[in-house]
Structure formats: structure tokens, C-alpha cells
């Protein structure tokens, strides 16, 4: 599907149907955490107009398997909402996913409030210009994201 999409031959209905099937499967298999190992949940969001949340669902499921609690803000999360949750919950890590460059604006990272303890800011997806996001860590895959988050919570 991804290769066809890159060639401009992708059928949007196939992509959307497969995405919904995968998200449903990830939600069904997500473990209900009764005693998470982190006292402050990790924040997962897609900034700007980003609608592609499948990576967030996969990360949330992988973290649940590790007994790590998350706040899942999902698609199209405005910077004002991200900032409010960061101030209110002081997450140990913030993971932001951007598929499109128009959503991977490096200014989002610097616009997050400065709090103590400072959360580890993690960026995933092809939409980020890594060289412009010096204050964040770019993660290359699901295992890398889980490893960085596990370190951030001190586990």
C-alpha cells in the first residue's frame, strides 16, 4: 500500500480500511493497566493537521505491554492542547508523530512549556526535519521509541 501511495497509485479507501482494521486490533489487544510502572503517563500526540495515528496506536499498545501508561491525544492536537497537558501532567516523555513535513514543524518542540523535571521529547515519522529539532530525540522505529520512553520513566 505504501509503495503504491508513493507512486501516486494508492487507493485511499484501501489505506483507510486497513488502517481501521489495524487500529481496532491494537485497541482490542491493549492491556488495561492496573498498576503502571510510571507514576506520570507518557504523552502521545500528532501535532498540526496530522491525521495518521496508526504509529501512535502501535506505540501505545507496545508501551501497555511494558506496563507503561500513556495519555493518547491522537490526531490534530493543537500546540495549545499539548502545552496544557505538559503543564498539567508533567509527563516524563512526549512522543510526537508527523507523517507530512507540514505537520513536523520544529517550532512545536520549542513552544512546549519549560517544566521540571524536563520531559524527554521524542519525534517519530518522516515529517520531521531532524537537523532543525536539536532539543528532541528522533526515534527510528517502535523499539527505539519504547527504549527511549523506558529510559525516560527511569525503568
Positions of the model-derived regions?
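Peripheral docking tails and interdomain loops at the edges
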Residues: 126-155
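Conserved hydrophobic helix-helix packing surfaces used for dimerization/oligomerization
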Residues: 40-43
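Short secondary-structure boundary segments
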Residues: 98-99, 125-126
Amino acid at each position: 500500500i505504501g509503495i503504491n501511495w508513493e507512486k501516486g497509485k494508492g487507493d485511499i479507501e484501501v489505506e483507510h480500511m486497513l488502517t481501521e482494521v489495524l487500529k481496532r486490533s491494537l485497541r482490542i489487544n491493549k492491556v488495561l493497566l492496573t498498576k503502571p510502572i510510571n507514576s506520570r503517563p507518557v504523552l502521545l500526540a500528532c501535532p498540526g493537521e496530522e491525521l495518521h495515528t496508526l504509529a501512535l496506536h502501535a506505540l501505545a499498545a507496545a508501551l501497555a505491554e511494558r506496563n507503561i501508561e500513556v495519555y493518547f491525544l491522537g490526531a490534530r492536537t493543537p500546540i495549545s492542547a499539548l502545552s496544557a497537558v505538559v503543564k498539567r501532567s508533567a509527563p516524563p516523555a512526549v512522543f510526537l508523530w508527523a507523517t507530512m513535513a507540514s505537520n513536523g514543524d520544529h517550532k512545536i518542540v520549542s513552544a512546549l512549556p519549560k517544566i521540571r523535571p524536563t520531559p524527554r521529547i521524542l519525534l517519530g515519522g518522516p515529517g520531521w526535519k531532524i537537523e532543525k529539532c536539536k532539543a528532541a530525540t528522533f526515534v527510528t522505529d517502535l523499539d527505539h521509541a519504547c527504549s527511549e520512553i523506558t529510559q525516560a520513566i527511569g525503568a
